[in-house]
Amino acid sequence: MLKNRVEVDRRRLDFSEESSAGEYNGKYLGFHEQAGETGTYRKVIYSQEGKLVPPQYHTWDRNPHHKDTSPSDKKYHSEYREGESDSRLDTPISIEAKWSHYSSEYFEASDSEEFDEKLASLRLLILEAEEEMRRIVQGRVDKHLEMNKEANEKKKEMKRRKREVLGEVNKVRGEAGDRDDRSCERPEEESDAKGTRIESFADFETSMFPYKSKNGAKSYACPYEGCTMELPTLSRIKRHYIVHTKLRPFKCLNKDCNKRFSRKDNMLQHYKIHCNYSNYR
């Protein structure tokens, strides 16, 4: 310990002599090791040959009334810290501190610029995606409208052709109707007689079928012997009864035709053959 203290004193004397002789560069950079009211700072000095002079640690005080000690003052306190490695002599601590300060600012600026670039690229990608989606949707809408337009045109064409065909059919039917009216003319007395026979037969049929009501349900019973069929409507029971009797009361209205039918609708359907309606059934 005593040996180290002697070495420090010797270096301090050498430093004082060199500072008075002006053989070193007096410019130095320091840093504060503590953030309190008092602390130490290290002074780094380079000689004219470029060699690093061992660092000196000086005390400092934040008190504004305190006077800083100058390097030429013999009363300033300096010490050489024990236990420090020789690597500190190779690289100036002040340069390291200054570089760390500027490097942190540089990295912060570079990070901010990089973030702005990424944000701008992300916004550009979003805009491109929205534009692409807009094009896709618009394309589908246009395609749908085009398909609807084609379908509507086809429907219009089909309706036009249908009107033309129906017009031709109605024209032919009108001409055929005029001929049928002339060919189907019959004496008024004959038609009245046939109508009377049909009506009387219908009345006779109606009186044949007794009406029943059971628990609010209507029904007509078949009058044929041995048949127990009951149907809810008169028309149905009539059709059923004709199966038993084999009656064909409805004769064709054409005087040249002798066909007879069990139902009036069947007779009228047959009568259209004589009126040239067979092509339109």
UniProtKB/Swiss-Prot annotation:
SUPFAM superfamilies: beta-beta-alpha zinc fingers. It comes from the Eukaryota. InterPro entries: Znf_C2H2_sf, Znf_C2H2_type. One of its GO terms (cellular component) is PcG protein complex. GO terms for molecular function: DNA-binding transcription factor activity, RNA polymerase II-specific; RNA polymerase II cis-regulatory region sequence-specific DNA binding; zinc ion binding. Residues 1-23, 55-88, 168-195 are annotated as: Disordered. The keyword Zinc-finger applies. The keyword Zinc-finger applies. Gene3D superfamilies: Classic Zinc Finger (3.30.160.60). Residues 1-15, 59-88 have a biased composition (Basic and acidic residues). A zinc finger (C2H2-type) spans 220-244, 250-274. Keywords: Metal-binding, Repeat, Zinc, Zinc-finger. This is Zinc finger C2H2 protein ECU05_0610. It comes from Encephalitozoon cuniculi (strain GB-M1).
